[in-house]
Amino acid sequence: MDTPIHVVAVVASQAGGNTDRLVGRVLEAGRDSQAGVTVTAIHLGAGPLDQARVEGYVQSLAGADAVVLGTPMYRSTYAAVLKELLERVPRGGPSERFEGPLRAKAVGIVATGGSHHHFLGVDPLIDLLVRYFGAYVVPPVLYGVIRSSGGDAPMDPGLAEDAVRFGRALVALASAIQRDERLGDARAQI
């Protein structure tokens, strides 16, 4: 029997753009992959993020079973507004239990760029999620090369298929974490 899964997507760009469209395809595939999957999308826009917005976003992340982080790549790194949000997500200190809204959750990274040259720019984000927040990152990162801006170009069929597989894998990982309490015991080491 499938357990309910709630997926929250944080999109570090404007609604309707290339990153948003690719994240949308992932969310649609995840929702369609099993009964009981619900999705919510948060658009960070250009920032800056005020404290009230950050607190609301953190509550949304805490209530999620799986998270998608969508970001365009600029100068071989992920969007500054996503970095700003993650820097303000609580995790706990050395004397605490390292609890936080991303700990032991399935997290999928969806990135877009104008070329393949920016692909490795997500590595610091993977490291942050796994080592600092104690999240389970869905491999591999979904990276889409989209050369037109504004979200009006047709999506490459191969990329669309990858997005479907990625969405299904995200929900499958979140379901596995829910079913096996040992996976939920993961803790950040530092």
Label each residue range with its predicted role:
Residues 22, 146-153:
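Polytopic transmembrane helical bundles with strong interfacial aromatic enrichment
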Residues 103-145, 161:
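Short, glycine-/small-residue-rich phosphate/pyrophosphate-handling segment
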Residues 1-98, 161-171, 175, 179-190:
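N-terminal beta1-alpha1-beta2 submodule of the flavodoxin-like/Rossmannoid cofactor-binding fold
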Residues 14, 46-48, 114, 144, ...:
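Residue-level detector of flexible, active-site-proximal loop/helix-junction positions
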